[in-house]
């Protein structure tokens, strides 16, 4: 479909095939949406397919485009596809149950459809109107239709971007823990970073740190926000998050998603703060908690990882932890904590060998 002959053939097939074959063709197109959307011919066919698809398939296409709106908004063809979907009556009907939201979106539709380069002043006024009510802003960005609109509005002007940023910051937790809202937050960060405004970039990263504990309670999008932030390997960001989770590392280590966050933090060599804070918790915790940690499916991995990192980077931490674990080794033998016992026993033997070696010298 991306080649001229393939494009002509696809156009003919859509014009003459029966309902069953059209549906099959729509399904094939759906599976290759991202590839087709980046090609001139493919994008034309894609728009035609979405237009003729039944309501069930239109809904599937709308879902897929909303999920990938961020990557689509990175190029002109993708933006034209988003605009095409926004202009469909089917898409407009998805918000008709909320009159206030529906009317506001109709105003955005009007501005966005006037020309390829929408009237920035009108967009700014509409975005400001949206911000008068934080609940309305939140409802707007978490709908598929609203999310698509924001994706193609972001980056058109600094004034409009500042308004959207204010909305994201005001409802930060709600936005970042929502599937579509999360994507708006990521796009907002990238728009300001691309413009060279690193202050905004740092503000968002600081907000992630401030709300770190709350975000850990959301194993889906909250966890995804963490992974994105930590994978930036930004020293201040890692430190913000580490401090935001202070006194909760052991608690998180018992949870599947929580242990993943702790592991990512202590693995991020750009900052030693997470390692120090985890050590403080382990040193302070009682023996029962330490045994539970060593014998827990997720906690065991954190303790093992911590021992390895402490030995490599903080030998004093490693020594303190070995001293704390030594009296507990018998209760760990024959359990999931056997690997911890093996590490301590190996270290003990190494120390003995060193002492003997020094004595012989």
Curated annotation (Swiss-Prot):
Its ancestry begins with:
Eukaryota, Viridiplantae, Streptophyta, Embryophyta, Tracheophyta
Q: Per the record, what is one GO cellular component?
A: cytoplasm
Q: Which compartments does it reside in?
A: Cytoplasm
Q: Which domain of life is it from?
A: Eukaryota
Q: Which GO terms describe its biological process?
A: regulation of translation
The Pumilio repeat ranges on this chain:
27-63, 64-103, 104-131, 132-167, 168-205, 206-243, 244-284, 285-319
Cite the entry's keywords alphabetically.
Cytoplasm, Repeat, RNA-binding, Translation regulation
PROSITE patterns documented for this protein:
PUM, PUM_HD
Protein name (Swiss-Prot/TrEMBL): Putative pumilio homolog 22
UniProt main location, coarse = cytoplasm
Which terms does the record give in the GO molecular function aspect? RNA binding
Q: Which comment does the entry carry about domains?
A: The pumilio repeats mediate the association with RNA by packing together to form a right-handed superhelix that approximates a half donut. The number as well as the specific sequence of the repeats determine the specificity for target mRNAs.
Q: What does this protein do?
A: Sequence-specific RNA-binding protein that regulates translation and mRNA stability by binding the 3'-UTR of target mRNAs.
Q: Which InterPro entries match?
A: ARM-like, ARM-type_fold, PUM-HD, Pumilio_RNA-bd_rpt
UniProt domain PUM-HD: residue ranges: 5-348
The family database entries (SUPFAM superfamilies) matched by this protein are listed as:
ARM repeat
């Amino acid at each position: 479909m991306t080649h001229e002959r393939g494009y002509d053939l696809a156009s003919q097939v859509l014009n003459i095939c029966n309902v069953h074959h059209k549906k099959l063709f729509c399904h094939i197109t759906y599976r290759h949406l991202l590839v087709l959307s980046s090609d001139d011919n493919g994008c034309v066919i894609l728009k035609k397919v979405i237009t003729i698809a039944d309501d069930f398939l239109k809904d599937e296409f709308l879902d897929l485009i909303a999920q990938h709106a961020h990557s689509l908004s990175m190029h002109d063809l993708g933006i034209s596809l988003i605009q095409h979907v926004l202009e469909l009556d089917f898409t407009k009907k998805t918000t008709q149950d909320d009159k206030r939201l529906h009317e506001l979106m109709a105003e955005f539709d009007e501005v966005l459809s006037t020309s390829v380069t929408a009237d920035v002043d009108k967009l700014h006024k509409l975005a400001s109107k949206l911000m008068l009510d934080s609940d309305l802003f939140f409802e707007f960005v978490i709908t598929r239709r609203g999310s698509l609109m924001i994706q193609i509005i972001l980056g058109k002007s600094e004034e409009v971007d500042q308004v959207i940023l204010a909305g994201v910051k005001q409802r930060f937790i709600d936005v970042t823990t929502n599937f579509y809202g999360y994507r708006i937050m990521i796009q907002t960060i990238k728009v300001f970073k691309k413009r060279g405004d690193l202050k905004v970039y740092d503000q968002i990263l600081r907000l992630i740190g401030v709300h770190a504990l709350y975000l850990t309670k959301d194993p889906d999008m909250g966890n995804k926000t963490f992974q994105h932030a930590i994978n930036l390997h930004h020293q201040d960001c890692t430190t913000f998050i580490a401090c935001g989770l202070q006194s909760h590392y052991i608690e998180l280590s018992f949870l599947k998603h929580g242990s993943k966050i702790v592991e990512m933090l202590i693995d991020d060599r750009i900052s030693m703060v997470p390692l120090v804070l985890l050590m403080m918790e382990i040193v302070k915790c009682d023996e029962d908690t330490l045994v539970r940690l060593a014998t827990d499916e997720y906690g065991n991995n954190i303790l093992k990882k911590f021992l390895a990192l402490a030995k490599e980077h903080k030998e004093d931490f490693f020594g303190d932890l070995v001293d704390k674990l030594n009296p507990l080794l018998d209760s760990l033998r024959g359990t999931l904590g056997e690997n911890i016992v093996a590490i301590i026993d190996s270290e003990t033997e190494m120390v003995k060998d060193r002492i003997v070696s020094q004595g012989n010298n």
